[in-house]
């Protein structure tokens, strides 16, 4: 049975992707930092829960090793954990810069590094949740956008580094998605992209032939004219 590890899997986009993977017969590990939330989400899906903060190297390593010990391999890695703190570069405290870099980029790198040996064995997939903010200037979300631009660059390089092993990587770049993270936008629910839209991108990619890959998917909000969705 194929398996997937989803960071940030207790809610939002990560949960939607995990639910769709479970519906299609995958064994799933959810990794998230709040024990109560990740255990409740895992119980709802019949998945395995790992309490892990993606800002911690130890937790990143443990999330992958726990999945390996439980399921023996890994077919799909979903790096969905992330956060954004609004502010200009000169207005953000160092701790807020470090937090975004630590979770959005460093944590993603560490989890991926640990998972690559398993993905080589399965000729698996990596899905990195980037953002449309990583594809265009985003005043007020400068650091967040920079971390997501880095994720896009990382994804493109991963494809070239790992193609001989049959491993493929996708950067998913949505605009505002109907999650708690986008509440500050003031947009109505029916104006936003849904978490299931992102999950559908994963499903589509997993149906590709071995000779095809889609390194970057941008999901725009219909009717939007703003830079980040």
Q: What residues fall within each predicted segment?
A:
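The beta1-alpha1 cofactor-binding region of Rossmann-like NAD(H)/NADP(H)-dependent oxidoreductases
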Residues: 52-62, 94
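Conserved glycine-rich cofactor-binding loop
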Residues: 10-11
